[in-house]
Each structure stands twice: as C-alpha cells, then as structure tokens.
C-alpha cells in the first residue's frame, strides 16, 4: 500500500503489482511494481479474467497437448539441411508441436553443457532454467569438436557428460521428432516416456500470448510491456541463516 500511495501522489498511472523472480536477492516471494508502457523493458503476463499478473520470468507455463499423430516406433531418418525447427518441419511436413527442440547452455563455473528439450514451437525461459540448474548459465558455444552436434541434438544417445532437462510441454506427446546426434539425421516416433523412462519434467517454457492462466485456467493471457519502478522481497531468514545471525532474547 505504501508504494501504491507514493505512485498515486506522484501521478504515475497504471502501475501494476506483479509476481516476480527473486533473483540475486533471494527469498521465497517477491513482487514488482510495473509502469505499463509499450516501451517497457520487461514483459508481463496479465489475465483479463481474474486479474493474475506476473513477470514472464516467474509465470508458470501450463501446456495442454493434443495427440494428432499416433504413436510409432523410434526410427532414424536422413534429414539433410534441417538444422532448424522450421527447416525440419518443412522437410517432414509436420507441425512444430511434434518436435522436441534442443536448447543448449553452459554452466558459468565449468562450461559443462546443459541441454533443455522443449516443444518446438515454444521458447526456454532462462530464469526458470537457471533456477532448475541452481547456478549461473550462459548460451552455449558449440565448437566443431564438441561432444554435441549442433542442429541435430537429441536425448537418445546423448553424451552422459551432458545435463539434460525436459520441459513440461513434452509430457504426454505420443509422437515427436528429435535430433539423432548425427549430422543431417533425426529420430521420428520419439516418445519421452518410452524412450527416456527416467526423464523428469520441469517447467522451463516462457508463457505466451493466449496462454493458460495459472490462476483461473482460462487461455486468455495477455503479454504487456512495463518498466520496473519498485520491488519488494520477502526474505524470510535467507540472510540471517547464511550469516548465522542470532540474538539473545529475554530468556538468554
């Protein structure tokens, strides 16, 4: 309320209170005050039905899949010149929703590879992936002599030196196309549950325009732009525990 009164007295219009990621500050809960404007540097997910609002970095992505292609056996196929999802879909005549896209990062500490698999029509939310990994990461540089084959990376047969994550968007899809870890080669008929039975799903996707609201469940999310003009953090005992801060109460 204090922030809201300050903004009102300053004559700042349309300041939205949105859920956000705590980032470096830490703590379990944080909220940002966003001045809504088309030239804002941040993206905000807003539900016009129930009023839910969150920075896209913190907004859960809820995906409901429909199986339009029936389950098939895993099959290695030649796919020359298909290093992107668009080229692959055009070559095989399939929708991007039936592809498992590999997005590659490296840990800042040791440059080890992290591969996040996500439905081909969606994008990775780097904040969510950073939180899942538990340390800082950066987009990968894949050299010619790398253990990864750029443009054709897949979970079947991938090096055990690579940390692999599967986004929730792949759960329950019967038929997927994914890289075969060889140049100009993909697997068709890939099924996560069958072909990678130990896979664990994590929410890594960016919420999208028209996406499902995490609060009311309606597919009406709007993505707006905003400028952060305030931020509050619920730190709890994050810093007091880390620094072993204690005090003597009336009982000593």
Question: What is the meaning of each model-derived region?
Answer:
Residues 1-252:
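Extended, low-hydrophobicity, polar/charged segments
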């Amino acid at each position: 309320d204090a922030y809201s009164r300050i903004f009102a007295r300053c004559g700042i219009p349309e300041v939205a209170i949105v859920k956000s990621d705590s980032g470096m500050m830490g703590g379990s809960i944080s909220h940002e005050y966003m001045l809504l404007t088309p030239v804002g540097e941040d993206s905000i997910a807003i539900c016009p039905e129930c009023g839910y609002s969150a920075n896209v970095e913190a907004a859960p992505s809820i995906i409901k899949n429909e199986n339009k292609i029936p389950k098939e056996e895993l099959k290695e196929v030649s796919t020359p010149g298909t290093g992107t999802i668009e080229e692959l879909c055009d070559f095989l005549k399939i929708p991007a929703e039936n592809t498992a896209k590999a997005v590659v990062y490296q840990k800042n500490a040791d440059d080890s590879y992290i591969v996040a698999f996500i439905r081909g029509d969606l994008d990775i939310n780097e904040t969510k992936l950073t939180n899942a990994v538990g340390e800082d990461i950066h987009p990968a540089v894949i050299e010619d002599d790398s253990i990864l084959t750029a443009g054709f990376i897949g979970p079947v047969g991938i090096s055990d030196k690579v940390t692999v994550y599967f986004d929730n968007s792949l759960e329950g899809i019967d038929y997927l196309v994914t890289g075969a870890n060889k140049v100009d080669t993909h697997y068709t008929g890939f099924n996560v549950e069958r072909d990678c039975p130990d896979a664990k799903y994590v929410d890594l996707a960016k919420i999208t325009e028209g996406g499902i609201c995490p609060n009311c469940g309606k597919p009406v999310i709007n993505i707006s732009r905003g400028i952060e003009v305030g931020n509050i953090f619920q730190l709890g005992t994050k810093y007091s525990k880390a620094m072993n801060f204690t005090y003597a109460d009336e009982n000593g």
